[in-house]
A protein has these predicted regions:
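Sequence context of c-type cytochrome heme-c attachment sites
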Residues: 19-112, 117, 123-149, 169-194
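Bacterial N-terminal signal peptides
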Residues: 10-20
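N-terminal secretory signal peptides that target proteins for export/translocation
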Residues: 1-6
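A contiguous, mid-protein "functional segment" used to position or interact
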Residues: 148-167
Length: 194
């Protein structure tokens, strides 16, 4: 009896689509280190104080927001007992949601909400100072170590119609509210390497 490969191909394609649209960036190749690791370097004025800017943002409070009265009301209406434990909620409120525990480092915490690695990729392979210097100097391609520069598509993995509170998404406006740029003199040296 001869089998058709159509069913197998369909399963593979479905898996590829799910991975492509997963909010977990870089989970298959790189480990997550957590925002505390990022903060070690990205809190200084010389670096642009990215960490304090993130701490003041809604992203840093995304997990916490799932315990708010509004979130609990929405969850109840959808038959969800605890939004802080529901995969359909945490997938966009927690960095590395759904990632295997072997893919997260000791400093990782779900309480960090939508942390650095949700947008910039899992950081274990680019979090060392020497690696970052290689990236900024152009000798290490950022993508080769998991560092990504987020774009509209990155944001729309969560800011979309699947969210029960979605009211449209203006990428440029949203980008301005979370801007955490490097100082111009450092940015001039920065090369993504592809």
């Amino acid at each position: 009896m001869r089998r058709s490969g159509g069913a197998g191909i369909a399963v593979l394609m479905a898996g590829a689509v799910l991975l492509a649209y997963s909010p977990v960036t870089g989970a298959a190749e790189h480990k997550f280190v957590g925002t505390a690791k990022c903060a070690m370097c990205h809190k200084t004025a010389a670096q642009g104080e990215q960490f304090p800017k993130w701490q003041a943002s809604k992203h840093s409070k995304a997990f916490e927001a799932l315990a708010s009265p509004k979130a609990l009301e929405i969850a109840k209406a959808k038959g969800i007992a605890d939004p802080q434990k529901a995969p359909e909620c945490i997938k966009c409120h927690v960095t590395a949601a759904g990632a295997d525990t072997s893919m997260v480092g000791a400093k990782y915490s779900v309480k960090d909400g939508v942390g650095c690695e949700s947008c910039h990729g899992a950081g274990a392979d680019y979090s060392k100072k020497s690696t970052m210097e290689g990236i900024t100097g152009g000798t290490i391609p950022a993508a080769s170590v998991g560092l990504t520069l987020p774009d509209k598509t990155t944001c729309e993995k969560c800011h979309n119609k699947e969210s029960p509170t979605f009211a449209g998404f203006d990428f440029e406006k949203a980008k301005a509210t979370i801007a955490h740029e490097m100082p111009a003199e450092r940015k001039a040296k920065y090369k993504t390497g592809g």
